[in-house]
Amino acid sequence: RGVDTDWLNEPLRFAVSQRHNLFIEGGDQTFRYGVGANIGKTQGVMKGSDRQTANGNIRLIYRKGQFSFTNNMNFDYTEADQESVAFSEFAKANPYMRKYDADGNVVKMLGYDYYENPIYSPMYNWSNNNINNSRTTGFTNNFEAEWRPMEELRARVKLGIRNTNSRGKIFKSP
């Protein structure tokens, strides 16, 4: 048929990332604090894939005499959308097959493989309402206490906890 279909060009895009940060700190010699937040969005090179992140943190430091106490808290959130059709499906598509029919509609089936199994167009699979996303929230708290009875000797205790919740959703239209 003389078709020279560039299947690899279809799912790709020029991706842009952005990130914004804010950090405020202050206090005196006894008590110091820091509060920060950042957000970001990263596009994937595959159309339909991206990642959004948000993070907040609080740092508190208390120093009095021989004692020092530090607490760091972090909250984070990530939402990610994955491409609904793998790039490998586009890479495997035959360049002699057409993407669209004579009416301009996406071709559903490209043909059959050696075992007579249907080969579906990645463009058709891509046009379905497929979903592949995930959300993750996390909390981290690190606490440290230090005692310095003399300059050459110190005792330190560190405690930390981490909690992460992830939820994903995958739906592929038949």
Each PLM stretch: what is its role?
Residues 153:
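An active-site-proximal structural segment forming one wall of the substrate-binding cleft
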Residues 23-25, 36, 58-59, 142-144, ...:
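Outer-membrane beta-barrel architecture
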Residues 1-23, 33-46:
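Short strand-turn segments of transmembrane beta-barrel domains in outer membranes
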Residues 17, 28-29, 63-67, 148-150:
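Outer-membrane beta-barrel channels and translocator barrels
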Residues 1, 18-20, 26-28, 71, ...:
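Solvent-exposed, well-ordered amphipathic alpha-helical segments
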Residues 1-3, 44-49, 55-140, 156-174:
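Surface-exposed loop/interface segments of Gram-negative outer-membrane beta-barrel transport/assembly proteins
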